[in-house]
């Protein structure tokens, strides 16, 4: 589990992905949709909450996701 502090001061926890998470997002054709849904699944953030993130904060979550996948 990793914690990321957003610019709003909110701390978001992201759990490590499991094979089941990859199976769920494999149904999406678009890579952006895959990533958005995977981040949502791992953090518990809703699609609306993710849509309202600044690009800087979203980038922090992308970086955390990448660290799990590499």
Model regions: which residues?
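Short, surface-exposed, charged amphipathic helix/loop patches that serve as local interaction elements
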Residues: 1-70
């Amino acid at each position: 589990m990793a914690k990321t502090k957003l610019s709003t001061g909110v701390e978001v926890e992201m759990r490590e992905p499991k094979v089941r998470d990859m199976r769920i997002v494999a149904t999406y054709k678009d890579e952006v949709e895959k990533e958005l849904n995977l981040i949502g699944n791992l953090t518990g953030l809703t699609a609306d909450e993710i849509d309202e993130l600044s690009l800087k904060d979203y980038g922090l979550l992308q970086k955390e996701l990448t660290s799990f996948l590499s």
